[in-house]
Amino acid sequence: METITISEVPKHVGETVKIGVWLTDKRSSGKIAFLQLRDGTGFFQGIIRKNDVSEEKFDSAKHDLHQETSFWVTGEIAEDKRSKFGYEIHIKDFDIVGESEDYPIGNKEHGIDFLLDNRHLWLRSRKPWALMRIRSRVKLATMEFFEKHGFTQFDAPELTGSAPEGTTELFETDYFDRSAFLSQSGQLYAEAGAMALGRVYTMGPTFRAEKSKTRRHLMEFWMIEPEMAWMHQDESLKIQEQYIAYLVQDLIDHCARELEMVGRSVESLKPFTELPYPRITYKEAIEILQKGGFDVEYGADFGSPEETYLADQFQKPVFILNYPKEIKAFYMPEDPEDSRQVICADLLAPEGYGEIIGGSERSYDYEYITNKLEENGLSKEDYGWYDDLRKYGSIPHSGFGMGLERFLAWITLQDHIRETIPFPRMLNRLNP
């Protein structure tokens, strides 16, 4: 007799198998009991008929199997097209492994604070399970995409020894005889990687001590940050939109079941695979907003209402190009057509989710970067190595960063990005 997982059930119809499962729910009707089962790879139904097991086993199924009890189940796999699972197991025997009395998360509605307090258990529920599967698939598809496009995965440090002057958004920790800071971005290090390897990308956690409670902010989140040597903005934008379309198509192909479980239809995602995405300039965005009744002027940064309105005009991701330099980072080069602006772009997701990618060309002018470091209070001692990248064989290069949780929140239609990470770290939450 073979031991299998629920995901392998379709290949074993008519066979007697053994599966390790947890009970998610059950109901009894006379001489039959219906068990809702999960094993980490999927969900399906088990049926125990009184005539198929001993009286002792049948009574045990009715009285000893509680929500999240773990047990080995043995039985024959049957196809059932009427069932939402498509298959079921006709149970002939079972052996309890772990008891589960008074499991705190029932089938009733629970408040969000209660669920976050019990996040370690909540992850077992269908929606978090589906979200974590989707998250895992996006990370795998990310690696596949960049591998196909000639990128090398590059690991940036999570501890840095420098903090920009005036910043209050860094987590500080002791580092022997000095202070260290948790990284806000791997970008600067990825630029060094691009000078060695051509095309690189980092993928890992970043940290922001940002005292914000909005649905779009976490203290710890994951970023995917590619950097590309010899590449200008137009080429970078093509990579960005191809990457997003690739992720969406990959989820359609591999996670249709999980998407359905979180309330996102596959059909609604298909338009996001159609390229190219619209592009408008920052100036054009200001005009669109003004015509829409927004009180904005040139120089304003966009918040959630503005980003939502702009993306709604296109009903698909849209690039906003070349923002004023005062609201963008020091390493972005000036726009040769308007020195008030820098060569950069944000990608806004539709459906109210706003920015999911921020990117730019990186200035490769040594004097320009040296002056910008001084203007921003960034010491030569801490950032001289970054300046060196322009001193020795500097070249045009571009890069971008995508927030993994923001992308996932959009794709899965979540109200808050905390749903898309296993253990969210927020302003008022550090446990579990």
UniProtKB/Swiss-Prot annotation:
GO CC terms in record: cytoplasm
GO BP term, pick one: asparaginyl-tRNA aminoacylation
EC number: 6.1.1.22
CDD domains the UniProt entry points to: AsnRS_cyto_like_N (cd04323), AsxRS_core (cd00776)
Chief location: cytoplasm
The reaction(s) this protein catalyses: tRNA(Asn) + L-asparagine + ATP = L-asparaginyl-tRNA(Asn) + AMP + diphosphate + H(+)
Gene Ontology molecular functions: asparagine-tRNA ligase activity; ATP binding; catalytic activity, acting on a protein; nucleic acid binding; transferase activity
Pfam families: tRNA-synt_2, tRNA_anti-codon
Family: Belongs to the class-II aminoacyl-tRNA synthetase family.
Alphabetical list of HAMAP family matching this protein: Asn_tRNA_synth
The protein, known as: Asparagine--tRNA ligase
Organism: Limosilactobacillus reuteri (strain DSM 20016)
Record gene name: asnS
